[in-house]
Amino acid sequence: NAITGEVSTLRGKKWLVLNVTDSHDKAFRKEGISWWEQERITQDDINKALISLAQHNDKVDFIFSHTGGTEVNRMLGFKPTHSDFMLDLVLNTADYDQHFCGHYHIDKLCDKSRILYDDIMLIASSDENDWIDIDGVFNITEDIKLKRLMGEIIND
C-alpha cells in the first residue's frame, strides 16, 4: 500500500506519495461532500515524509502528489496555497528524478514536475505492459491498481 509520507519500493524504484491538495474553490463546496479537511497536508505528514526520505539518504526515483508545489503554480500563473508551500519542504529536500502531479487538467513538463492529464507515462518498468494513465490506473502484471495519482494501491 502507498501510505502518504512513506517511501515505497516498486519494481526496484523508490517512490514517495504525498496527499497534498487544497480545494481552491472550497467556498463553493460543502465540507464532507465535495471537499474534505483531511485532503490538506499536515505538518505531521511533512515530518513523516522527511524522516522517511532521510532513511533513504533523501533519494527517491519518483514523488507523486496531487498539486505541484509553488514553482509549478507560479509557472502556470496560479497563486500557491499553504499545501504547495508544505510540499516544497519535501521537494526541496529530496533528490528525485521526477515529480508527478495532476490537479491542473493539462499535460505539461515544468522542470522536474510532470503534470499529467491525458498523457500516458511508462515508469518503473522494463515491461511494456506496465503503465500509468491519467485516470489513475497503475497496471501491473499482478493487477495492482493505483486508483488515483494520490490514492492508495489496492490488490484486486
What are these regions (language model features)?
Residues 70-138:
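Conserved beta-sheet core of the metallophosphoesterase superfamily
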Residues 6, 19-22, 67-68, 102-104, ...:
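Active-site metal-binding loops of divalent metal-dependent hydrolases
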Residues 9, 56-57, 91-94:
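Alpha-helix C-terminal capping segments
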